[in-house]
């Protein structure tokens, strides 16, 4: 099924998303990879506040290439989600509602998705130039010393993703194997 949603992505939205749904997202989301995730968890361990508003947030696992003239961002394809698996459950428990990446997730992440009624989306790997056309603005908001791995806030219009793991734990990577 095809659905259009806007951020922030709340539990009201995630409960209606099913594994295998094609979804187009419009709104603000964060961009962060493993180095930024590690810093956020280290900040939490020191009892510091996160540098982003995690409640009902969407984090896209991506490291952009430099922007061309007149564009907000360069190629913007997803990175492998498993690199964030050791950090994601804690952020989900704090209110993150959606993750976008590519590839499988650990049992701990899937359990946290179910527990928090969140969702894991996949974006098409190898299509970073096309995906970047959906990104209308991009701003580094923290950890700028990390370069391409700094946390960004982006605004997207009709950003295409597929629900891989829905809020009930249904996993497209498992069900599609059985189907085909």
Which stretches of residues belong to each language-model region?
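Active-site/ligand-binding-proximal alpha/beta "capping" segment
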Residues: 88, 164-180
């Amino acid at each position: 099924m095809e659905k259009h949603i806007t951020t922030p992505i709340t539990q009201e939205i995630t409960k209606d998303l099913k594994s295998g749904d094609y979804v187009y997202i419009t709104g603000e989301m964060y961009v962060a990879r493993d180095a930024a995730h590690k810093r956020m968890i280290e900040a939490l361990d020191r009892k510091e506040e996160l540098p982003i508003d995690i409640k009902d947030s969407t984090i896209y696992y991506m490291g952009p290439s430099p922007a061309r003239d007149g564009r907000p961002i360069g190629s913007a394809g997803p990175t492998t989600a498993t690199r964030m698996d050791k950090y994601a459950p804690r952020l989900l428990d704090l209110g993150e509602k959606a993750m976008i990446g590519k590839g499988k997730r650990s049992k701990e992440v899937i359990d946290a998705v179910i527990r928090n009624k969140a969702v894991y989306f996949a974006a098409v790997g190898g299509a970073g130039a096309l995906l970047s056309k959906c990104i209308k603005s991009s701003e580094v908001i923290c950890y700028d010393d990390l370069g391409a791995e700094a946390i960004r806030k982006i605004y997207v219009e009709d950003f295409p993703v597929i629900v891989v793991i829905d809020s009930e734990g249904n996993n497209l990577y498992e069900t599609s194997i059985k189907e085909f």
